[in-house]
Amino acid sequence: MSFVLRILLAVLIIFLVEFYFIKKIINAIHAFFPKADSKKVKRIIRIITAYINIYPLYLILAWFLSSQTRIDLPDTIWFHYFIVYPFWTCILIIIQSILILLLIDLLRIILFPFYKKHREKINLFSRKLTFILIAFFILYVPGRIIYDYFAVSIRIKEFNVHNLHPDLQGLKITFISDIQADKYTDRKRLDNFIEKVNSTNPDLVLIAGDLITSTPTYINLAAEMVGKINSKYGIYSCVGDHDHWSYRQDTKRSVREMTEALAKYNIKMIDNGKFDFKIGNADLRMTFITNTYVNRLTGQPLDTLLNSNGYDFKILVVHQSGDSLIQKAKSYNYNLFLAGHTHGGQVTFIFPYIKISPTMFETQYMRGDFYFDDMLMVINRGLGMSLVPFRYNSTPEVTVIVLNDKKQFSAK
């Protein structure tokens, strides 16, 4: 699909979504406040609608005038606080509300034969319920956005391993991903996150890439902040998507500058490579594969890198997971598979029995732990944001993986 068609499709979707929501909210207001002036209500809603749509109109106008597919936003606080944030907050409120309202409408259609004699009463009740739901989400969505901006969850995962080497018993691996230093994830937010990482007292720290979002501006900040992490056996990272995008037209330079900045703080960013070391008498191998939109290792080079024998514990660190890579790691007897990229479903909507996120269209491995026989795969929720400048129902995460011998753990 061409860029122009994507723009037109996005505009059409926004129009239809807002049209449905506006119709619902006008009916709901009249149900709750029957004496409300209809013209004033509609006028206020039109003004609010026009205001929140300044952002997409700006993007369309900027694209039309520049003919570029990538539009750089003004780097001013007021533009983000008064234009960008209101648009995305309102869009999330609208979509979250519509998901529930569509379900209610569907139930009304299905149950219509049973209540058609009381149609007017049911319709009035439905409109009042609509008002209550929208009012709730107007409060909940911004509140949750604020919470997910400031909060960091520490998740501890006990990994019970068959025949674990005694010297690896209790090894604490702190795993993070998608830090994405930028104008939104600034020094203060990074400080809070690194403080949480250090509070886990890690033996080993592994990162699934994406230390910045874009532009070289934040390379040194990202390296400096990660350099504050205390780790007994060091800090290691694979290459992520955004690590390629400091210079959009020169991805190799982007990765090189990020790698060099990290090296100043004794942090290794490994691009399709491996690192071996001993913990006591235990031999540990870590393999780092660049599995991103820009670069994917496949075929014989991938097999050569993954193939290894004679190690007591093997870890694979990648940015993006994927079924073929998972099966490869499993076939080469890796114990632990670590990935990020998804932000845990950065925007996740509330819905009965399931969580709905756009990330579901890309991968089934959105967050949490997955077992493939004896291999454990962990998908970390990360810290940063992409496209939408905040998180919704996806609290940033530091994952702590503690190794235990399965027999000893079972005996307890």
Can you name each region flagged by the protein language model?
Residues D75-W78, R144-I146, A151, N160, ...:
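Short, functionally important structural connectors and interaction interfaces within domains
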Residues Y81, Y85, I156-G170:
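Short extracytoplasmic/periplasmic juxtamembrane "stem" segments immediately C-terminal to an N-terminal membrane anchor
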Residues F112, F159, N192-E195:
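Short amphipathic alpha-helical coupling elements at transmembrane boundaries
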Residues F137-N163, K183-K188:
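Hydrophobic alpha-helical transmembrane segments in integral membrane proteins
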